C-alpha cells in the first residue's frame, strides 16, 4: 500500500512538471508571435475544447516628426550575415575587444599632475587656509549591536590607572552634528582613512575602492535654521547634509594614506593603480611621486609609511610581496630600491617609528615578519624573525614603544613586545628564535569580514597623552574596539545611526579622536 502511495505521489509530481513545461512553452510561443518573430501556427483543436486565441491587432505606426539619428542595434539576420559566418564571428570579436579596451583604459593610472577641478567629483572647493587651519565574539558570526565590553567591565577594574583610561576612552561620544548615516564621505567602500595631524580641528581623509578621496572638516556646525527645524517633520527635506569634498586622484583602490607631521600640507596616497601621489592641500593639486616606469606595469601598492624624522623618503609594499623605498629628492631610476620579501601578497606593514630601519610585514602566507633594512639582501632577504599564524595575517602595526599589533583570519589580535627585548639596541644582523618571536598577548576578535567588508586592521595612536599605549580596530558587531598594549580592552564605541560595520578604524595621532569607515562610504566620528 505504501508503494502505491509513493508511486501516486511521484505520478502527480510528474504530471505537474509536464503541465508547467507546457504552460511555459505556450507563453514563449505567444511572446514570440506578438514580437513578430514567426507567424502563428494554424489552430488545432485542443483536448480541452479551448477556443482559438484571437490574433492581436498589429500596433498602429505613429509617424515621427524627427527620426532619431542614434545608431540602432541590428541582428546578424537583418544585416544579411549567416549565424556561423566568419564575418559575424569577426564582428563579435571586435565588439568584445573594444569593450575590454574601454574597461582597461578606465583602470590605467594617470601619471599627469591634476588640478583641483580635474580631480573634483563632488562637494565644495577646497581652500588651503580653511582646510588646514591656522595651526571577544563567536568565531565568524557577527551579532549587530551586541556588546562584549561595557560599564560593568569598567566598574570591576581594580587598577586605578587602567580604570581612569577606560572611563576616558569609553566617554568618547559620536559627533552630534549629523548622524553617521548622513555622512557619506566616499561614493564606494572605504578602504583606508587617516586624520590630519592638526589638533585644532578634526580633518578626516578617506579613500575608497574606486580611487575616490573624501575630505571632511568635522569642525563645521549644522546651520542654525536646520537646528531650529529638526523637530519639524515637514522640514526634514530641508535639513542640509554636512559639507564634504570628493576628489578622484587615482583610478583604482586607494589602499593607504599618510600625512607626515613635519609636512602637514601634503597628503600621500598609495593605490592599486601602482602609484603613490602627493596631494598639496594648500594648492589643491595632485602630482605623482612614484610609479613603475611604464603605465602597463601592474604592481598594486598595498601600504605606505614614512619615518617620523624623514619627510622625503617613501616606503611601500605591494600585493606581489615586494617592499620598496624611494627618496623623492633624487632621480627616480637611481633612488628606487626594492626587495622581494614574500611569494604572496603583503597586506600591511609599518616602520618602527623611533628606529625606522626596523619594519614589520603581514602576509597572506600566514606570517608576521620583522626586518632590518640595514641587513637586507636584495638576492635572499632574511628577516630578523618571523611568526606563523594558523591563517593569513592582515596587518602588522608598530608603535613607538617597539610593540607590534597584528590582526589575523584566525580570529585573533596578537601583540608582540620587542621593546622589552631591547630592539632599540640591536645591531645589524641580530636575529630572533621562533620562541622569541611568539606573541606576548593574544586577544580573541572576530576578523571574518567576508567579501563586502574591508579587512580589519589595528592602528595605534602615534603619540598618546599617557604612558599606556592603545590601538583601535573595527568590530563586526558595528562598534570600534580600543585595546591597550597589554590586551586590556579600554572601550567599545558605538551609537545610534551606525547601520554598517565601521571596519576601517583610525586614531588621531595625539588627540582622542577616533573615526570609523564603512562599506557604504559613510563614517562615524567619536570625540
UniProtKB/Swiss-Prot annotation:
Residues 52-62 have a biased composition (Basic residues). SMART domains: WD40 (SM00320). GO terms for molecular function: DNA binding. WD repeats lie at residues 185-226, 249-289, 296-336, 341-381, 388-427, 450-493, 496-527. Residues 35-90, 284-303 are annotated as: Disordered. One of its GO terms (biological process) is DNA damage response. GO terms for cellular component: chromatin; cytoplasm; nuclear periphery. Keywords: DNA damage, DNA-binding, Repeat, WD repeat. Belongs to the WD repeat DDB2/WDR76 family. DNA-binding protein that binds to both single- and double-stranded DNA. Binds preferentially to UV-damaged DNA. May be involved in DNA-metabolic processes. This is DNA damage-binding protein cmr1. It comes from Neosartorya fischeri (strain ATCC 1020 / DSM 3700 / CBS 544.65 / FGSC A1164 / JCM 1740 / NRRL 181 / WB 181).
Amino acid at each position: 500500500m505504501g508503494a502505491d502511495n509513493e508511486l501516486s505521489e511521484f505520478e502527480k509530481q510528474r504530471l505537474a512538471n509536464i503541465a508547467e513545461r507546457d504552460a511555459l512553452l505556450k507563453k514563449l510561443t505567444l511572446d514570440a508571435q506578438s514580437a513578430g518573430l514567426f507567424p502563428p501556427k494554424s489552430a488545432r483543436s485542443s483536448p480541452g475544447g479551448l477556443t482559438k486565441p484571437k490574433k492581436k491587432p498589429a500596433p498602429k505606426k505613429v509617424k515621427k516628426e524627427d527620426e532619431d539619428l542614434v545608431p540602432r542595434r541590428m541582428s546578424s539576420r537583418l544585416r544579411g550575415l549567416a549565424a556561423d559566418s566568419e564575418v559575424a564571428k569577426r564582428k563579435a570579436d571586435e565588439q568584445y575587444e573594444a569593450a575590454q579596451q574601454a574597461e582597461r583604459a578606465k583602470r590605467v593610472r594617470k601619471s599627469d599632475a591634476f588640478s583641483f577641478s580635474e580631480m573634483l567629483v563632488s562637494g565644495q572647493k577646497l581652500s588651503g587656509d580653511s582646510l588646514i587651519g591656522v595651526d571577544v565574539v563567536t568565531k565568524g558570526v557577527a551579532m549587530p549591536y551586541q556588546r562584549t565590553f561595557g560599564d560593568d567591565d569598567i566598574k570591576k577594574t581594580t587598577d586605578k590607572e587602567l580604570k581612569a583610561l577606560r572611563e576616558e576612552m569609553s566617554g568618547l561620544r559620536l559627533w552630534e552634528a549629523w548622524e553617521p548615516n548622513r555622512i557619506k564621505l566616499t561614493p564606494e567602500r572605504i578602504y583606508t582613512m587617516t586624520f590630519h595631524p592638526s589638533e585644532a580641528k578634526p580633518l578626516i581623509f578617506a579613500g575608497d575602492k574606486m580611487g575616490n578621496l573624501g575630505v571632511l572638516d568635522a569642525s563645521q556646525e549644522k546651520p542654525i535654521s536646520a537646528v531650529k527645524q529638526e523637530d519639524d517633520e515637514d522640514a526634514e527635506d530641508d535639513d542640509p547634509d554636512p559639507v564634504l569634498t570628493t576628489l578622484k586622484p587615482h583610478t583604482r583602490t586607494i589602499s593607504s594614506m599618510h600625512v607626515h607631521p613635519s609636512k602637514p600640507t601634503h597628503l600621500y596616497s598609495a593605490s592599486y593603480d601602482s602609484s603613490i601621489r602627493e596631494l598639496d592641500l594648500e594648492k589643491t593639486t595632485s602630482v605623482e611621486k612614484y610609479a613603475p616606469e611604464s603605465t602597463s606595469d601592474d604592481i598594486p601598492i598595498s601600504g605606505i609609511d614614512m619615518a617620523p624624522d624623514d619627510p622625503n623618503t617613501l616606503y611601500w609594499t605591494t600585493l606581489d610581496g615586494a617592499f620598496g623605498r624611494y627618496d623623492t629628492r633624487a632621480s627616480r631610476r637611481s633612488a628606487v630600491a626594492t626587495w622581494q620579501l614574500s611569494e604572496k601578497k603583503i597586506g600591511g606593514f609599518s616602520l618602527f617609528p623611533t628606529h625606522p630601519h626596523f619594519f614589520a610585514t603581514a602576509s597572506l602566507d600566514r606570517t608576521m615578519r620583522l626586518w632590518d633594512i640595514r641587513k637586507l639582501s636584495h638576492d635572499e632577504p632574511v628577516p630578523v624573525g618571523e611568526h606563523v599564524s594558523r591563517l593569513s595575517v592582515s596587518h602588522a602595526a608598530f608603535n613607538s614603544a617597539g610593540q607590534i599589533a597584528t590582526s589575523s583570519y584566525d580570529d585573533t589580535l596578537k601583540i608582540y613586545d620587542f621593546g622589552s627585548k631591547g630592539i632599540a639596541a640591536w645591531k645589524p644582523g641580530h636575529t630572533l628564535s621562533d620562541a622569541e618571536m611568539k606573541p606576548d598577548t593574544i586577544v580573541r576578535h572576530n576578523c571574518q569580514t567576508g567579501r563586502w567588508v574591508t579587512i580589519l586592521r589595528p592602528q595605534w595612536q602615534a603619540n598618546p597623552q599617557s604612558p599606556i599605549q592603545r590601538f583601535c580596530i573595527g568590530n563586526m558587531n558595528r562598534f570600534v574596539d580600543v585595546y591597550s598594549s597589554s590586551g586590556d580592552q579600554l572601550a567599545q564605541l558605538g551609537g545610534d545611526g551606525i547601520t554598517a560595520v565601521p571596519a576601517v578604524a583610525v586614531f588621531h595621532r595625539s588627540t582622542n579622536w577616533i573615526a570609523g569607515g564603512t562599506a557604504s562610504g559613510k563614517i562615524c566620528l567619536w570625540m
